[in-house]
């Protein structure tokens, strides 16, 4: 497309009003770090992998109109420098139409901005969303997760995340495999629901997969009220969870 050739030529001062697809626009561009915060993205519906492996990019794009976007899958995956230019304006994004946030911040080493106000009411897939994040530890406890079915590996090896997410509606979730998984002995995830026992209120009645959910995780909250009647795989669920000591007898 014309916009692709202009971007390839290094021309970023573009009229983007009619653009609907931003998939992989800057994927694997290791040198790109130009201000594009002024772009009109009001008609963009898909941003899959837009900055995937764009390892230098760290600009403020918080003013973007994302009201038409339906998928942000892998949008910043492996964008190791991205932190929205140090600005919390990304919290203003309208994500009300987004259904897919799979691996959105996967392996983003620097990102740690408040996104707690995002409307996630239509999101169904959060698999790997914050997996292998070294900095992210923001309050996302108010998110509407009522339609999310997949939370597998969501915080896998998220080395500093420890927030209270006990108010999440998990009634639609079927997969929590590896959700808080660490890498193993000596390398644990710190998740403990922000020190709150509210996670005991989670509706887990639809969850089938809980394999390695708290594997090598410093978790120790009461989850004795969880409904595990649908679970078929709990293999290694608490393996290397050295702190866990709760009554699960029912």
Where are these regions (language model features)?
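Negatively charged
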Residues: 1-250
């Amino acid at each position: 497309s014309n916009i692709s050739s202009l971007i390839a030529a290094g021309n970023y001062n573009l009229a983007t009003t009619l653009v609907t697809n931003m998939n992989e626009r800057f994927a694997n561009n290791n040198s790109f770090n130009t201000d594009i915060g002024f772009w009109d993205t009001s008609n963009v519906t898909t941003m899959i992998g837009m900055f995937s492996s764009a390892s230098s990019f760290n600009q403020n794009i918080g003013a973007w109109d994302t009201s038409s976007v339906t998928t942000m899958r892998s949008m910043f995956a492996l964008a190791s420098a991205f932190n929205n230019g140090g600005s919390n304006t990304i919290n203003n994004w309208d994500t009300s139409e987004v259904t897919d946030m799979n691996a959105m911040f996967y392996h983003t080493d620097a990102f740690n901005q408040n996104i707690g106000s995002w409307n996630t009411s239509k999101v169904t897939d959060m698999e790997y969303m914050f997996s292998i994040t070294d900095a992210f530890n923001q309050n996302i406890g108010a998110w509407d997760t009522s339609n999310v079915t997949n939370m597998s590996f969501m915080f896998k090896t998220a080395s500093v995340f420890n927030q209270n997410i006990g108010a999440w509606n998990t009634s639609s979730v079927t997969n929590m495999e590896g959700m808080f998984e660490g890498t193993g002995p000596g390398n644990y995830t710190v998740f403990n629901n922000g020190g709150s026992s509210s996670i005991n209120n989670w509706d887990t009645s639809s969850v089938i997969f809980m394999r390695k959910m708290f594997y090598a995780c410093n978790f120790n909250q009461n989850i004795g009220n969880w409904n595990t009647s649908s679970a078929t795989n709990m293999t290694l669920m608490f393996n290397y969870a050295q702190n866990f000591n709760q009554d699960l007898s029912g």
